[in-house]
From Swiss-Prot:
Name of the protein in its database record: Small ribosomal subunit protein uS2
Ribosomal protein in keyword set: yes
Pfam families xrefs: Ribosomal_S2
GO terms, molecular function: structural constituent of ribosome
PROSITE patterns: RIBOSOMAL_S2_1, RIBOSOMAL_S2_2
Similarity comment: family membership: Belongs to the universal ribosomal protein uS2 family.
Keywords: Ribonucleoprotein, Ribosomal protein
GO cellular component: cytosolic small ribosomal subunit
Gene Ontology biological-process annotations: translation
PANTHER family, alphabetized: 30S RIBOSOMAL PROTEIN S2 PROKARYOTIC AND ORGANELLAR (PTHR12534), SMALL RIBOSOMAL SUBUNIT PROTEIN US2M (PTHR12534:SF0)
Keyword Ribosomal protein on entry: yes
Gene3D superfamilies: Glucose-6-phosphate isomerase like protein, domain 1, Helix hairpin bin
């Protein structure tokens, strides 16, 4: 299982929180102090909490669990998509649509529409339409791909959420809470840790920090999946004997 050291976190700037005037008092247990009116996160808390989260994500993925990566702010968007693709998982990296989890039935219909449009764009259907109709469908396809492309093959609700910025993604966290889906989240000094099952106190803005978290999670999920495949192979080998 991938682990992250304190040195890695220091180099990535994980310890830099937000300005002291924007703090959430619920984050006090994870704050070391302040420097130049910026809160400093206590990495002696972050390191074990992150590694505990990785261990749990490894267990979930080794049971074929589906992990949904969520990070819709611009700084995290591309990194979230890359990490999810790296470990064959799922992502929402533009806008969280209200009801994405709690109203899955409706979302599923939109995903079906997205897949239908994808087929139409490839099988020549668009070519038979008027220019205006083809343009309208092309725009609809792009819009659906933008919002649902990362979950179109999820095939049902995820088994866990990994969230960059608990404050920014509070709607996603609330929906997961309502459905009993465990939430793993990077929680900065300005955020509310309530509703997060596995709190990872850390900088949620610096791209180096965000890339560090996502890289470790993707590697852990890949390893967890390979454990699952290895145990399946072992079982089939025993059966064959």
């Amino acid at each position: 299982m991938a682990t992250v050291s304190m040195r890695d976190m220091l180099k990535a700037g994980v310890h830099f929180g937000h300005q002291t005037r924007y703090w959430n008092p619920k984050m006090k247990p994870f704050i070391f102090g302040a420097r130049n009116k910026v809160h400093i996160i206590n990495l002696e808390k972050t390191v074990p909490m992150f590694n505990e989260a990785l261990a749990e994500l490894s267990k979930i993925s080794s049971r074929k669990g589906k992990i949904l990566f969520v990070g819709t702010k611009r700084a995290a968007s591309e990194a979230v998509k890359d990490a999810a693709n790296n470990c064959d998982q799922f992502f929402v990296n533009h806008r969280w649509l209200g009801g994405m989890l709690t109203n899955w039935k409706t979302v599923r219909q939109s995903i079906k529409r997205l897949k239908d449009l994808e087929i139409q764009s490839q099988d020549g259907t668009f070519d038979k339409l008027t220019k205006k109709e083809a343009l309208m469908r092309t725009r609809e396809l792009a819009k659906l791909e933008n919002s649902l492309g990362g979950i179109k093959d999820m095939g049902g609700l995820p088994d866990a959420l990994f969230v960059i910025d608990a404050d920014h993604e509070h709607i996603a966290i609330k929906e997961a809470n309502n459905l009993g889906i465990p939430v793993f989240a990077i929680v900065d000094t300005n955020s509310d840790p309530d509703g997060v099952d596995f709190v990872i106190p850390g900088n949620d803005d610096a791209i180096r920090a965000v890339t560090l978290y996502l890289g470790a999670v993707a590697a852990t999920v890949r390893e967890g999946r390979s454990q699952d495949l290895a145990s399946q192979a072992e079982e089939s080998f025993v059966e064959a004997e």
